[in-house]
């Protein structure tokens, strides 16, 4: 897709694009995207998240690795919407993360806004910059590399 189409995707549409399901689906809505360029998505963080039972019971904080996973899932949606190939039988897998920084804790009740920008794409590899914000403040950032793989090759 080379057009500059912009759209909003709800949870039903996201379920059709990502293989993740509860409790590991970490994108609730896509606010905006431009194929081949960028995406803005949202994860609404609630006290009902299963990870808050142990991280940490008295001071619940969203684990940083799950913030990275939420960014990766948003990036996966961007990849799917940026290609003409079917997602049927494919998985989007992390191959690396660089310059990972956690700037602000994420708590129950926060709305995590996920921004991913495509840096480059070559063959099956996609490199993106991801930034997660809460109330306009940077909570986490990273450069992420992922590969699109066929399920039967795994």
Curated annotation (Swiss-Prot):
Keyword Lipid metabolism on entry: yes
Task: Determine if RNA-binding is one of this entry's keywords.
Answer: no
Check the record and name the InterPro entries matching this protein: FabA_FabZ, FabZ, HotDog_dom_sf
Listed A to Z, the keywords are:
Cytoplasm, Lipid A biosynthesis, Lipid biosynthesis, Lipid metabolism, Lyase
Where does the protein end up?
Answer: Cytoplasm
For this chain's UniProt record, which GO biological process terms are given?
Answer: fatty acid biosynthetic process; lipid A biosynthetic process
Q: Which PANTHER family match?
A: 3-HYDROXYACYL-[ACYL-CARRIER-PROTEIN] DEHYDRATASE
Q: Tell me, in a sentence or two, what this protein's role is.
A: Involved in unsaturated fatty acids biosynthesis. Catalyzes the dehydration of short chain beta-hydroxyacyl-ACPs and long chain saturated and unsaturated beta-hydroxyacyl-ACPs.
Homology family: Belongs to the thioester dehydratase family. FabZ subfamily.
Q: What is this protein called?
A: 3-hydroxyacyl-[acyl-carrier-protein] dehydratase FabZ
Please report the organism this UniProt entry assigns to the protein.
Oleidesulfovibrio alaskensis (strain ATCC BAA-1058 / DSM 17464 / G20) (Desulfovibrio alaskensis)
Q: Which gene encodes it?
A: fabZ
């Amino acid at each position: 897709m080379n057009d500059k189409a912009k759209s909003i995707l709800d949870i039903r549409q996201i379920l059709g694009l990502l293989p993740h399901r509860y409790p590991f689906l970490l994108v609730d809505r896509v606010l905006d995207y431009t194929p081949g360029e960028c995406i803005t998505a949202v994860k609404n963080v609630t006290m009902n998240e299963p990870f808050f039972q142990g991280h940490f019971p008295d001071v619940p904080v969203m684990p940083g690795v799950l913030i990275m996973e939420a960014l990766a899932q948003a990036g996966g949606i961007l990849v799917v919407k940026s290609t003409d190939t079917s997602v049927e039988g494919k998985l989007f897998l992390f191959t690396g993360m660089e310059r990972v920084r956690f700037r602000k804790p994420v708590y129950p009740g926060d709305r995590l806004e996920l921004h991913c920008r495509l840096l480059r794409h070559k063959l099956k590899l996609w490199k993106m910059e991801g930034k997660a914000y809460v109330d306009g403040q940077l909570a986490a950032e990273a450069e992420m590399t992922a590969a699109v793989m066929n399920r039967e090759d795994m």
